[in-house]
Regions:
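Phosphate/NTP-binding elements of NTP-utilizing enzymes
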Residues: 2-129
């Protein structure tokens, strides 16, 4: 790998670490029910929720369905796992299937990342990333 490429990767890594919104827009893909794998484009209100998550680690979001908050939470969880390894992520839901769905979203995003953004070792348990 050339020094130029290493420098670009290092700069991009630092940029991703500094901004979860940038990381999600640039490198996260989601599974759309009709269009398949698509880039995760944040809506303006999702940017606001993301800022809320960053400024208030214990956030409660009153929301309606189909706003993409679960997907946003999955992306934020992935960002935290990659760039804040001193943190633990716990997913609690009303049903086990809902929690498993969140883990599936995170895994899908993780699997779509470029290799230089992925962790070197991946846990073997199905409910962990």
């Amino acid at each position: 790998m050339s020094q130029d490429l290493k420098k670009k990767i290092r700069e991009e890594y630092v940029r991703c670490a500094a901004s979860p919104a940038y990381f999600m827009r640039k490198y996260c893909y989601i599974q759309h029910p009709k269009r398949g794998r698509i880039q995760f484009n944040l809506y303006p209100f999702q940017d606001k929720v993301l800022t809320l998550f960053q400024e208030n680690p214990y956030s409660i979001v009153l929301k309606s369905r189909q706003l993409g908050i679960s997907t946003l939470s999955a992306g934020y969880s992935l960002w935290m796992m990659l760039f804040h390894q001193d943190k633990n992520i716990l997913c609690i839901a009303t049903k086990q299937e809902t929690a498993k769905n969140m883990v599936t979203k995170v895994k899908f995003m993780y699997d779509s990342l470029p290799s230089w953004l992925k962790e070197k070792q991946k846990p073997s348990e199905d409910n962990k990333l």
